[in-house]
């Protein structure tokens, strides 16, 4: 997709660095158009660790490419975090069958609440409250 649309590619989390690098090289994407970022430990962190950097580059629209079973939660979190900085997201699902694992509503709404709290306070409530296995 990045090559078809001649867009820069930002990989944040998901697959390990070696696998991401292999795919990028296999697909023939120019290295100067690709940024790998592994600071985040979860979906909220994928957005909060990058949103201000993306905005400072003048980006106002992002294609969010992720597995179809993760897209709804990613969009819920991303629309709050990126939206707070004036960045629009368009979700692009990647098929995951037969390995799809549906993410529950508790996880989705929990991460959405974390995103809203981060926008208001600049902090992740998980850091203050301790880890809750239901949100992972």
Walk through the language-model features, giving the residues of each.
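A structural signal for short, hydrophobic/glycine-enriched beta-strand patches
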Residues: 1-106
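Trafficking entry modules
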Residues: 133-136
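A transmembrane-helix-recognition feature enriched in membrane-embedded lipid enzymes
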Residues: 101-131
